[in-house]
Amino acid sequence: MSKASVYEAKTESFIQPILDSMNFELVDVEYVKEGGMNYLRAYIDKEGGITVDDCEVVARQMNEILDREDYIPDSYTFEVSSPGLGRPLKKEKDYVRNMNKEIEIRTYRAINKSKEFYGLLKAYDKDTVTITDEDGNETTFNKSDIALIRQALDF
């Protein structure tokens, strides 16, 4: 297990009770290096959407825990954010939330001369994702072939 995975798992275990008490959902935790800086990020959500004030309350409570537990020896910045509209589907609850909604799939290699697919999410399991396009055609993708899967953005 990488040190990033250890930090993420430990952070999840500390932040989850805070979020549960507020009826918020933990979407993801990531520990990444960007531009020479380390970032520990928690992405949270709730029915109706997360506000800046929500993020601030969670960050304040979590910062107390991070200072007390001090399990990350490196210098880092802790951020709490809404996951944003274009976030990838990663966890089971992301798939459940997006059932029968329009999603975008990008594949690593072209399938029938295309790498981008749009359709309604109809089914998923640990290995596959099935969508139905606007013509009613059903396509099943192996998750190992998917580079990106997210809710489609309508503009």
Swiss-Prot record:
Example GO biological process: translation
Gene coding for it: rimP
Signal peptide start and end residues: none
Taxonomy, superkingdom: Bacteria
Keywords: Cytoplasm, Ribosome biogenesis
Function: Required for maturation of 30S ribosomal subunits.
GO cellular component: cytosol
Subcellular location: Cytoplasm
Gene3D superfamilies referenced in this protein's UniProt entry, alphabetically: Ribosome maturation factor RimP, C-terminal domain, RimP-like superfamily, N-terminal
Protein name as annotated: Ribosome maturation factor RimP
Family statement drawn from the similarity comment of this UniProt entry: Belongs to the RimP family.
